[in-house]
């Protein structure tokens, strides 16, 4: 669910910092509670992937297809698939290119659902609801 928030930079530039900080804190808490088995690797590379994806998402915010920022939903899918897929392949194996593709594919599927099935409707609802839109003014 939280991955749907990776599209919030479409609405306001400050969301780049927000989603990046949220990712960092979640990864940090996950390490300390034992929930994040990738550990420091994910704190550094996962957060960097989120920042990169958020910046790209912001850059593509005005590219629309039938009013939806479809292009802006692509960077979180691709960047997280590559980075988190590599983390998972390194940590759990198999440490082969095929292993990486398998891990990256799994991450991409989850990201596709989060960004396209949840994130795009979330952006649409915020943009169409005056009370919500007021929270996301530039």
What are the language-model segments listed below?
Residues 1-21:
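Hydrophobic transmembrane alpha-helices
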Residues 4, 24-138:
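Membrane-embedded alpha-helical hairpins and interfacial helices in multi-pass inner-membrane proteins
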